[in-house]
Amino acid sequence: MTEMTEKATTFLTSQEAPAFPADRTCPYQLPTAYSRLRDEPDALRPVTLYDGRRAWVVTKHEAARRLLADPRLSSDRLHADFPATSPRFKAFRQGSPAFIGMDPPEHGTRRRMTISEFTVKRIKGMRPDVERIVHGFIDDMLAAGPTADLVSQFALPVPSMVICHMLGVPYADHEFFQDASKRLVQAVDADSAVAARDDFERYLDGLITKLESEPGTGLLGKLVTHQLADGEIDRAELISTALLLLVAGHETTASMTSLSVITLLEHPDQHAALRADPSLVPGAVEELLRVLAIADIAGGRIATADIEIDGQLIRAGEGVIVTNSIANRDSSVFENPDRLDVHRSARHHLSFGYGVHQCLGQNLARLELEVILTVLFDRIPTLRLAVPVEQLTLRPGTTIQGVNELPVTW
């Protein structure tokens, strides 16, 4: 046994392994348990998952980048030892996996079918439509005001309508898919998650049937007309791709919108800087993405071979979780990492991941957030929380970070 192997074996089996994931008590700060992990000198720390198994959590930014780009770490969620952070992962181990849970070359083949819709040029051309949608929902809020639930009346419907237009999904069905999505990503047990996925798949199967006769101009219609008809993708694979794009296309931006509003309102100096200089908005979006890191449990991997990282050993078959909320607070990369600073250059955060699995929709998310944060505060400059931030109910650490309700007034 080498010195490194002996150290790694002893470390993994005998060291304290705190429960993971942990819940936030503040929308824009790390859980205390994560701060402790971040402040440890080692790049890897063992944690205990809900089912009692252990996995490695990556605590350093540079190590996280290296591991996310390492082909010896697999994203295969069907692997028996994949580090599931919640019972709801059972829903992703049934049926055809989405490409987020695939490895090259299959991952690249499926991703390339959709990537043309998410290029910088294509997304830039969507700005007028996004602005129109944002203004429309603000008009509705103002007409019904002077109070609102920002989640249900703005943060959720804006990205829902945007992704519906992009995919060719009828927005008239938004109440169904928003509910099914919430039940899927916030399920606390396996049966609830599987039931939500089944409901979603039945809906998408019916939608694909309609698109086969009337494909329209959306991305799903194009996939039906070309990839499905040509046999490049089967029906189950198309359904799983559609589910991924629809859920990720509205859930994440909705959560980022709500938490960004909370965070700016709780940091009046940073909010004032943005109001005084709108050119800061793109950089502020990157800083908010860094600080909020809403998908901070999305970086699960399984080692297919032994990997040495900074003198520590990940053995083949061990789970690894790159928690971007921790990596984004690495003080060797970001000075004063727990401080929100809209003047900071934060573009190298890991909130969209890194490597071949880097978020497909990041250009769209950036556009939506830039428009939302500009237009919302221009139209409602007196916007404020209707309850103290301490009274907001935060989602648990097992799901996309956010709030399900956000009372505001003006």
From Swiss-Prot:
CDD domains xrefs: CYP105-like (cd11030)
Induction: By sodium ML-236B carboxylate.
Keywords, alphabetical: Heme, Iron, Metal-binding, Monooxygenase, Oxidoreductase
Matching Pfam families: p450
Keyword Coiled coil appears in the UniProt entry: no
PROSITE patterns reported for this sequence: CYTOCHROME_P450
Superkingdom as given in the UniProt entry: Bacteria
Amino acids binding heme: C359
Molecular function in Gene Ontology: heme binding; iron ion binding; monooxygenase activity; oxidoreductase activity, acting on paired donors, with incorporation or reduction of molecular oxygen
Listed cofactors: heme
Enzyme Commission number(s): 1.14.-.-
Top EC class of this enzyme: oxidoreductase
Protein family: Belongs to the cytochrome P450 family.
Quaternary structure, from the entry: Monomer.
General function of this protein: Catalyzes the hydroxylation of sodium ML-236B carboxylate to pravastatin.
Name of the protein described by the UniProt record: Cytochrome P450 105A3
Species of the source: Streptomyces carbophilus
